[in-house]
């Protein structure tokens, strides 16, 4: 009888918790998240400042009841196994589960309204059948971007491909599926994206999820739109080259270029996605390596981490911009590498200072490399510096390149090195892929990291310099002991006299 009562009480508690953030443990996790179509889970630790900032917004969102959706949280200090199961490496981490299975990580703003918007967008099917054209027209007024798949029925390849691809765009696009006869001006068996302001793009390529995903990533941004902190994430995932028009909105030349960007962006869409940024508000030119004496508007193309800069000796016009993009597409524009000057003496006490211009030389030297990416202003980097200097001296007489690079003043190829925080240390085996160092940044740990991955020579189990230091310490102790004895003997002699 008591057992039945406890079960009933637990179920009642669960029902009452539909408008709060449920506490999840390894014992109840799988069963609990399977109870709802959508379950948004926050992984946190109490000591994290960002977690503390998120907490009130999270609670406000959790207190609103949304059909078929629940919210929960995992304290990773008390539930380390759950944190490990989902490879939680930073806090807070928010993961969406759909029908009990991990679907995606939440990367939006951490406010109540944004969280609720995200949850609502993920409830129900990603693609809605449209029974008439007016339904789509109303959606175009309510949403910034609307996507319509024009197909005969829901069993076509277009329908199944769109349904799968749409899962990743629920927040940024509103999806419909409709019979072609409802849109007589459009080509049947195509996918049409409508953006506010009257812009439209059509996909009639292969019905493959990967190709359609690339199209949707591009088509949700305007032909020549402004990049802002709110939409930056949309541009950051585009695989096609992205061109940045850097403008000063109050200057005539910038106004003229900005007014032409929609037409230029539409014309050049197959080569490049064009955007503009107000450098008076967002001085991105500093990070892109644009010279301080550059004339504005300026233009920079970015592709696979490399920068391609339009001449900054003259202002960019519509004509020069179109010419530049076509030259770029033809492979006739060389990348502009942001780099500090090459130091006169590159290696001091075993540590090599690398700049962007010399990176490739060292990567192809035939040697293994241990490289530190740092920022001059970073406190953790300053604390780690003596340890890294000690490592450099330890391997000074070996074939290992122990190097450092100022990642704020030099171009870092993101396809080779993923640097998301400072300091970051990689071991690069000769001809191999970089391996990131993880763990406490102690001399012993870094030394063992090198010993584990080195390929061009053998590393002893114990560091040579540490052994020498211990030997030196013992000798110093012995010397001091002898000096003390000598002093005592001297005093005795004086007393005897």
From Swiss-Prot:
Q: Has UniProt tagged this entry with the keyword Signal?
A: yes
Q: Could you state one GO biological process linked to this protein?
A: response to endoplasmic reticulum stress
Q: Supply one GO molecular-function term.
A: protein disulfide isomerase activity
Q: Which cysteines are disulphide-bonded?
A: 48-51, 378-381
Q: Where do Basic and acidic residues bias regions lie? A: 467-480
Q: Sites of glycosylation?
A: 30, 63, 85, 153-154, 250, 278, 413, 465, 476, 482, 485, 488
Q: Name one GO cellular component term.
A: endoplasmic reticulum
Q: At what residues does the UniProt record annotate the site feature described as Contributes to redox potential value? A: 379-380
InterPro entries reported for this sequence: PDI_thioredoxin-like_dom (IPR005788), Thioredoxin-like_sf (IPR036249), Thioredoxin_CS (IPR017937), Thioredoxin_domain (IPR013766)
Q: Domain Thioredoxin spans what residues?
A: 15-124, 334-455
- Where are the residues marked Lowers pKa of C-terminal Cys of second active site as a site? 441
UniProt protein name: Bloodstream-specific protein 2
Tell me the organism: Trypanosoma brucei brucei
